[in-house]
Amino acid sequence: MGAERKSIVTTVEASLICHSCSWRGEISNLYSCPVCGSSLLVAYAGTYELPNGVVDEGIWRYRRFLPVSADSEPVTLGEGATPTLQTRRLDPSGGLLLKNETVNPTGSFKDRPVAVAATVARELGLSGLVCASTGNTGVAVAAYAARAGLPAACVVPEATPAAKTAQIGAVGARIVRVRGNYSDAYALARAAESYGWANLTSTYINPYMLEGDKTVAYEIFEQLGKRIPDWVVVPVGAGPLLAAIHKGFEELGVSGPRMVAAQAAACAPVVSAFETGAKQVSEWEHSVETAASSIADPLRGYPEDGTRTLSVVRQSGGTAIAVSEEETRQATIELARSEGLLVEPGAAVAAAAYRKLAAQAVVSTGERAVVVLTGHGLKDPDALRSAAGSEAETGVVEAGDVEALGAALEVYQ
């Protein structure tokens, strides 16, 4: 049942290295260090130089520092090249910028890591793609598997929103609902590795996923005129996106920015460790009940992933902060009504965290912060309905009732 281990020769000399013991090996279908069992990352020889051209080309303009061979055909749907938007109404000072990942092909940032990992999997000749997911990764894996001509299976928690599972099933992936939370789905998905399937779960398990995530940093750097923001605020479950963005800036040979791990208070293992000064993150033993389902990861069975994220936050001089359900709901409303951006609750957590940090003067006036908006609001229609409230509609009026129309418009006068 096990798959033969194959390797890829990359454009720039690259290798897998262990996050903990510094073991080094070739680019292959390996998910953990053969010496100590820790997670792996990809390292390249030399400092990355940005290519000529425009950011509109998407993530594959950076392929020289991605773990694929020079002549490989990318598995792509046009991911990346997402805008970094200046806010005016939400933050008149101009210090807040929004990295809008909702415009990726399947509506979330997960298209970046999945595109790279699917390309690697196809190059290695693996049998299919599997993931554990709260929805967004599953949708991306299903779509990119279809694009690659590979089978896909998505293991999801029982409470995953129907809007997300409908998208997964629509593109032909098998959906396995697990009674339990994300950690339970994660444990089951790992079993597929022994069948020669690539595990594209969005934790630290697949080192090639982070390579797609890091392109967010490359784009921010270019879109800001090759300048570094003071802060980058990222909604966090296990935290690979945050770590990957930090890695991307490091590969550019620049210092900063300070990284902020934003979590929902109902599931905040990284924040808890940060606030108590702990060196290691513990599994979240409380109930996990939050509208921000896309980042509700209690890390049960793999708390070391949270520890890795915590280490990056501290290394960058950043912070970790939790926000309440009401703060998240308000941020969802503000983004929609002030900036025209529909985001899911998991993404709104980052915006709520920024507002909280600004109010506490952690983020100072004059500093620039990029908030990463990770997923589209259409991923979770129920959350949108809750945020909109009943006051948005006037009720049914008679055709031709100009007075009723005028009454509806009076709210803007």
Protein language model features and the residues they cover:
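PLP-dependent amino-acid enzyme catalytic core
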Residues: 2-413
